Amino acid sequence: MFDAAFPNNLTEELCAVRKVMPERTFSDCPITISKDAISYALDNRIMEFPDRMYLMDIADTTYDILNQTQKQILCCIYTRSCDGYVREKYLRRLLDMPFDQWAIPFIVKLCDEYVLEIIEVIYNQLKDRDNTDIQSFCANNKTAMVKSYARMTSYWNEYYRKREWDFGKYVGRRLFRECLGYNRTFEK
């Protein structure tokens, strides 16, 4: 689980994280991860992780015993939780720490989701940051970013258009344009 999501040099750290993760799933779901996978290119390799993970959250006391790299790995993994509150909790933790390049795909993937509060958290954390690293990642994954932008737009149209009728002011669009560096050249 999540083997292809992290660089090979993090194998030991990933194993340590797996040991503290519960085996119990939400509502005793018979699967721990979805079959749908997310793929991005990073550092000349394909990173792949499940769209959703159904494992229960861990206790904060367990989180506290992990080292910084292990915490970052755990935060990345739990951004794929089926529970939006859990995704937001670990996203906040991830954005509050200095994160490595390999964490960027997990942050970027959350930018096209339907939970407005998560999009607002990302925008508010990234808007005043130098996002050159994230923008470079997005520019190297243009096909995936075009799909993500379309998905974000679709969610705005379906769920948030009545609240924010001007798409130019919608936080999801501002996130993609201002923080992720998305522009029309991605579509060519």
Give the positions of each predicted feature.
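Conserved hydrophobic register position within alpha-solenoid helical repeats
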Residues: 90-93, 118-123
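Buried hydrophobic core positions in alpha-solenoid tandem helical repeats
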Residues: 74-76, 104-108
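Extended repeat-based scaffolds of very large eukaryotic assembly and lipid-transport proteins
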Residues: 1-89, 129-131, 135-188
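Residue-level signature of the C-terminal ends
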Residues: 93-97, 125, 129
